[in-house]
């Protein structure tokens, strides 16, 4: 049975360093959980690895806690994970141990990596008498409760109510800045979101924080206030960095807070491609003028400018800037390979990059700049989110895809995509109806009425077989649409720009995107 160690125990980084002062954390092979390797480790190293794993386990369980109205009055705890509700600590521990071993392993690795960084720099920091902003403000304690808002003046129902689509709100934000102790930030963010009854996803790394959370407007307002007053972020974040949209806690199945190597998964170490060397930021107004100039050119294929969509194909499929180059890639981690494979396309070009909220462009533009082939690289500050706030009827047509249960936000009436079955204009995604398939499909009401609710012929056939019972667990995704899609497409040197009002046609695509 996993340890029930409280996540608060051992969170003080100095305590960890004192206990593990002789551990060579640079040798990351030590964290391999294989039994054969464990047998080769000496007792001291086993003990140290065990401590890190217990901490990772406790932090993971902590992120699965869900607030209840009674939690304000008593110490009752509930946990929600994988769409299941757990009422006792034993059951949630058993579930995490059996179903989330990989996540615990990666969290353990992250803890050890962060300790390695701290250990390697602690002596130099001490000799230089450099100050850590967090330690300066918290000289006596790293207790996260010191940085939680006072909500005693609010009725608990005020934080919970108003979470519906009309009254609630979803925040989207990121902040690139060096963080010395991501694990502490993780524990603090978990406690903060639980206190405010927020759900969502928050990624934390040594390079910063990236979050999207939903709840009542009171809860999101308090969250922003806390973030703007926190010592590590107050000089890097402003209120305008938080993009807002209608929604609430219901937009996310649960709260997920974790520590990763990157705050957006590009697949390249931040040490190799840093956020500190991005493309030039353009305000929505400046970007609008650049796009207007680009579209006014008689022959855009011969232009020295490329309008580049940094998102995945299923995002640009339902909304995009007119004349953009929208890579047919499924994940942002494919973007570097896409650039490498199409490097000549960008040679001597001015590149205007954009994404949903701006975060992918930060390191994406840094990667493109590092190739040394572009004239200039620009990025849309605040992303499509901020552009549409200022120009709802501008050059962006269609819907804005979002990574939550809303799937898309609408700022204009344009429909730029079509039903995968009949070609009628349609842009409302639904999950493929086949069990265990996590792809999205565009199928209009008429086609849905005829039973066409899967992402491809293979999945449609699976649905008709209605596999259930023990066999369902081994009924793996085998989508034709994914199998036939090139992982990294090669563009023509004179790329075909994307239209904004495609005519319906019989040759509709049958491929639906994977929701990641």
Curated annotation (Swiss-Prot):
Transmembrane segments: none annotated. Keywords: Phosphoprotein. Residues 490-516 are annotated as: Disordered. Coiled coil: none annotated. InterPro entries: Rhodanese-like_dom, Rhodanese-like_dom_sf, Rhodanese_C, TrhO, TRHO_N. Residues 301-396 form the Rhodanese domain. PROSITE patterns: RHODANESE_3 (PS50206). Residues 506-516 have a biased composition (Acidic residues). The active site is at 355 (cysteine persulfide intermediate). The modification Phosphoserine is found at residue 269. SMART domains: RHOD. This is Thiosulfate sulfurtransferase/rhodanese-like domain-containing protein 2. The gene is TSTD2.
